[in-house]
Design a protein with these regions (language model features):
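Zn2+-dependent metallopeptidase catalytic core
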Residues: 6-26
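Active-site scaffold of zinc-dependent metalloenzymes
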Residues: 33-72, 89
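Post-HEXXH active-site segment of zinc metalloproteases
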Residues: 72, 76, 88-122
Length: 124
């Protein structure tokens, strides 16, 4: 069986994000998937480079961030999906349905992701 080969700094960046935002690493699973990413919901063409999934197990929330190998910038995609997680944790809203992207919300998450990645890279 072949193991997963993560992009450089992928695991370290995940740990950094968990520490920065106080996310319990035992409740977060991160997958780097060679599977085909799903197409964008709505009329826009393209595909999701990453996804955030949620479930409850034994009364405790668990989260899965999937970053697809098709992602052009896997660390940035990881940070973007993590930004969704932080937003959901703050709001308490864990909607599981794929919807067409909200451009203004996605832009704010992209900015947070860029800032988080820059902060991480400055500590290397």
């Amino acid at each position: 069986m072949e193991g997963t080969h993560y992009p450089r700094h992928f695991v370290d960046f995940t740990v950094f994000l968990c520490q920065k935002y106080g996310v319990d690493r035992n409740r977060l699973f991160v997958e780097y998937s060679s599977g085909l990413p799903p197409p964008l919901a709505g009329p826009r063409t393209g595909y999701y480079e990453g996804l955030l999934s949620y479930r409850e197990k034994d009364g405790h929330p668990e989260f899965l961030i999937t970053v697809f190998k098709a992602s052009r910038e896997p660390l940035l995609t990881l940070a973007h999906e993590f930004a969704h997680l932080v937003k959901n944790l703050k709001s308490g809203n864990f909607d599981k349905h794929l919807r067409p992207p909200d451009d203004s919300a996605e832009k704010a998450l992209d900015e947070q992701a860029l800032n988080d990645l820059a902060e991480f890279q400055s500590t290397e």
